[in-house]
């Protein structure tokens, strides 16, 4: 994922920052507690496509 794109993307629910997951397959919104998938290099920024973070993921800094 292009770092410039990551700088301008925000969570569609909270408008907060997103963090690229360690395996680079998801964009994580800690505020919303959601992980948005990245498919074929394109972030899918739909709440209906996001998965809820588990407790450990929400607390992981």
UniProtKB/Swiss-Prot annotation:
Family classification: Belongs to the UPF0434 family.
Protein's name according to its UniProt entry: UPF0434 protein PSPA7_2181
Family annotation (InterPro entries): Trm112-like (IPR005651)
Pfam annotation, one family: Trm112p
Single GO cellular component term: cytosol
Disulfides per UniProt: none
PANTHER family with a match to the protein in the record: PROTEIN PREY, MITOCHONDRIAL, ZGC:162634
Organism: Pseudomonas paraeruginosa (strain DSM 24068 / PA7)
SUPFAM superfamilies assigned to the protein according to its UniProt record, in alphabetical order: Trm112p-like (SSF158997)
